[in-house]
Amino acid sequence: MNRIAFLLVAVAAVAGVIALTAPAFGHADEAASPIYGVKIPDGYRDWKLIAVTQLVTAKGTQLRAQVGNDIAFKAYQDGKLPFPDGSIIVALHWTRVSSESNNKILDGPFPGDQSFVVGSRVNMQIMVKDSKKYPASGGWGFADFTGDKPGDEALHKTCFPCHEPAKDRDFVFAHFAP
């Protein structure tokens, strides 16, 4: 009888571990990007910071932060290219806005708009390295989400062509900020 009870507890524990670890890139019921099937990764807001960038275009200015899972972060830290399979990089993009409260404080020594902070969220872009699953796109799967909704197929068809100029850096734009 004790053996049966132990076996039932062990089976339940294994089933619980599998259920908790199965969704590697998000929950099964979440939206996935067309073409690549990439989902928003669970826990990405707890990942390590890789880089902070600013994008200035005719459409406006964005502040951007790139975070990576442990595999991607270690590759950046070690300067390892190409990135190993399992690397995931998430780029978070916001509008850049002037900080009225900071600028009031800085107004004496530094008049004018001197301090800028993140404004509204623009989008999130995700790169997942799996050289077997994505051989036609340099080993990377891509996703572009606005809110929790992926962009359409036409948008996702532009991902790899956009990244092709960065081929010498394994198709990744972000430089590591040590």
Residue ranges and their predicted role:
Residues G26, E30-S33, G37-T61, K80-P178:
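Sequence context surrounding c-type heme c attachment/ligation sites in exported
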Residues M1-A5:
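Positively charged n-region of N-terminal signal peptides that target proteins for export
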Residues L8-T21:
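Bacterial N-terminal signal peptides
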Residues L63-G79, P109-F110:
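N-terminal post-signal-peptidase region of extra-cytosolic proteins
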